[in-house]
UniProtKB/Swiss-Prot annotation:
Species this chain originates from: Mus musculus (Mouse)
Assembly description: Component of the mitochondrial ribosome large subunit (39S) which comprises a 16S rRNA and about 50 distinct proteins.
Family statement: Belongs to the mitochondrion-specific ribosomal protein mL37 family.
GO molecular function: structural constituent of ribosome
Iron among keywords: no
Main localization, broad class: mitochondrion
Keywords: Mitochondrion, Ribonucleoprotein, Ribosomal protein, Transit peptide
A Pfam family matched in the record: PDCD9
Compartment(s): Mitochondrion
GO BP, sorted A to Z: mitochondrial translation
Annotated GO CC locations: mitochondrial inner membrane; mitochondrial large ribosomal subunit; mitochondrial ribosome; mitochondrion
Annotated protein name in UniProt: Large ribosomal subunit protein mL37
Highest taxon of source: Eukaryota
Transit peptide boundaries: 1-29
Length: 423
């Protein structure tokens, strides 16, 4: 038997004091061996200063150092004497200049309406019509409006966004979704030689918008930025005739009692009642034409459902139309002699939502009278799936790289909405 060295003998002899039979295993608590708690330690309790009437607590303020048996002094808040933006402290809500007793329910870009389109229709006093207007569908079916080699060019746009543009094996949605929409808009702009009136339009991004209106006893506001807006020098032509507008008086708006119509809207007491189209006075392209909404979140829980996306499209299109109507006709609530038409397109890079809104009235307080009109064409697939890598089984290419089930009809509707007002 080999003799152990001095340090080894001392380690074996001293292991008995560690517990567990002297085998050198350290003795620890049960929770230290298992999964430890993730709860943060309790904060240190604040020193209580007993305020006894007629007696002044004895503190260590004059000592200039901590004394454990004396009370902690209470110092007044320190003022720098100048405003440091790194340590800005906002005033209490009730002391701010824009504070109001009446709450305002605000809809912004990240609001997801629980009831979706049904809730948006009630908030905007709008009647829903399934399908696109006949005037737009006539542009879809007219071969004269098609682009030369149209289908192949759209396929190239899809492949460029999802395969050629990025160095990643499988590009993310936030990469290919804006690229597909921008490329499709650029393809539509190529018709400017055939339709010179397209030169009277321009697109802008991140335009601020704010519109406020009363709906029954509620004060509502749409506020935020739009991703891309196509504006023009001339407004879109009216879609529904005067007889169709008057026929909306008999339409009854669907309610969703007992759910509150303001559910999922942000309740706020600090707000400003204003109408802002996002453009300064004298802007040469003042009339909104089409709004483009991109649902480019990579994670599924962060994406809008199609119903919620259509509701957001309706509310922002309505807000743009209402702000434009008040700019042209004033703030008086009335039925518009010349209704305002605004279009909207929403997509996640694969599924498209189309919407056309006609604002007929700015009298939104009551549910009676003339209603606004909206036409929707929902869940239009541009393609069903895109293979970034070929599917090979038994050394045979089963699915080649590229889109699956391409639907050219979807781009025709996209192009028809772009050409609406010119053709």
């Amino acid at each position: 038997m080999a003799l152990a060295s001095g340090p080894a003998l001392r380690a074996l002899a001293g292991s008995g004091r560690l517990g567990l039979g002297g085998y050198g295993t350290p003795k620890r608590g049960a929770y230290e061996w298992g999964v430890r708690s993730t709860r943060k330690p309790e904060p240190r309790p604040l020193d209580r200063v007993y305020e006894i009437p007629g007696l002044e607590p004895i503190t260590y303020e004059g000592k200039k150092h901590f004394v454990p048996w004396l009370a902690r002094p209470i110092f007044p808040p320190w003022e720098r004497g100048w405003n440091d933006p790194r340590f800005h402290r906002a005033a209490p809500i009730h002391e701010q200049t824009l504070y109001k007793e009446e709450p305002c329910y605000i809809f912004h870009q990240r609001c997801r309406l629980l009831e979706g389109m049904k809730q948006a229709l009630w908030l905007t006093k709008t009647k829903l019509i399934e399908g696109l207007p006949k005037k737009v569908l006539s542009l879809v079916d007219d071969p004269a409006n098609h682009i030369e080699n149209q289908e192949q060019r759209v396929l190239d746009i899809i492949s460029h966004a999802r395969l050629w543009h990025s160095t990643e094996d499988i590009p993310k949605r936030e990469t290919y979704c804006p690229l597909i929409v921008d490329s499709l808009i650029q393809l539509c702009k190529s018709q400017i030689l055939k339709h010179p009136s397209l030169a009277r339009r321009t697109s802008a991004q991140n335009c601020t918008l704010a519109t406020t209106w009363n709906r029954e006893s509620l004060l509502l506001q749409v506020r935020g930025t739009s991703s891309t807006i196509l504006s023009a020098k001339d407004p879109l032509p009216v879609i529904a005739s005067r007889e169709e507008v008057e026929a909306t008086r008999s339409h009854v708006l669907e309610t969703f009692y007992p759910i509150s119509p303001t559910i999922d809207l942000q309740e706020c007491h600090v707000y400003e009642v204003k109408d802002d189209t996002g453009f300064q006075e004298g802007y040469p392209y003042p009339h909104p034409h089409t709004l483009y909404f991109l649902e480019k979140a990579n994670l599924r829980p962060q994406r809008f459902l199609p119903e919620q996306l259509r509701a957001k499209m309706l509310l922002f299109a309505f807000a743009n139309a209402l702000a434009q109507a008040r700019l042209l006709y004033g703030n008086t609530a009335k039925v518009l002699e010349q209704p305002i038409v605004v279009q909207s397109v929403g997509t996640d890079g694969r599924v498209f939502q189309f919407l056309v809104l006609q604002l007929n009235t700015t009298d939104l307080a009551s549910s009676e009278g003339v209603k606004n009109l909206v036409w929707t064409d929902s869940d239009q697939l541009l393609y069903r799936h895109f293979w970034c890598r070929p599917v090979i089984k038994k050394k045979v290419v089963v699915e080649p790289v590229g889109p699956v089930d391409f639907q050219p009809e979807t781009f025709r509707k996209f192009l028809a909405l772009y050409l609406h007002g010119v053709v």
